[in-house]
Amino acid sequence: MSKHDNVIGYIEYLDSSGCVQERIPYVDAEEFKTRIYASLYCGEPIIPVVFPENLSQPLTFEKGTIFPWGLRSEKHELLPYEIYQTNDRKISFLRYNYTKGHINAASYKLVYRGQMECWQTLDSLYCLHNQENRPNGRKMRSLSVSDIIVTHEGGEAHAYYMEPIGYKQVDDLLPGLEQAKKRSVEMGER
């Protein structure tokens, strides 16, 4: 049983353009409903997302409650992600601006495959993979500048180059990283 098996849903907080800025999970139905009502009352743009299979009884709202940005019911699913690292001295531990002319996906190796919750962010993956007891810690170094995280959601993949602060989207490297993944699988690496 995963530590997130008891999550009953999450709230998507939207920015002014309607894009999801943050997702916060909830395990307690009353706390979840209270936060939803508080956000709706203040006019905060949110989309509550409910996992019905994780509820002991249906989540009900007061008659006439309007969700201007929507209310969704979903199956609780984990999203796959991968981490790629390189030992190429021309790009290892360097910012993207210094390396963009030298980056070659073929120099990267798939070092980890895992699953993340839909509310997890690149920053939360960074924290997870920089702990002393990080996943696959014996076979990969902690995450650092020049590493690439590939996320998968809704049939789309996106690649992110780790910068000293933040991430640079590098989807143009996806075809080469897919080849690196195939090489790793053929060699029996995980």
Regions found by a protein language model. Give the residues of each.
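Extended boundary segments
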Residues: P58-E117
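Charged, low-complexity intrinsically disordered segments
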Residues: I24, I36-A38, F67-D88, P135-K139, ...
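Short, compact, well-ordered microdomains
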Residues: K139-E178
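Non-Sec secretion/translocation targeting segments of pathogen effectors
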Residues: R183-R190
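N-terminal accessory interaction module
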Residues: M1-F61
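Short, conserved turn/kink motifs that form compact alpha/beta structural patches or helix kinks used as
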Residues: A105-I148
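Tryptophan-rich substrate-binding surfaces of secreted polymer-degrading and adhesive proteins
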Residues: Y98-I103, G114-E117, P164-A180
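Ordered hydrophobic segments in well-structured contexts
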Residues: I8-E12, P80-Y84, I148-V150, H158-Y161
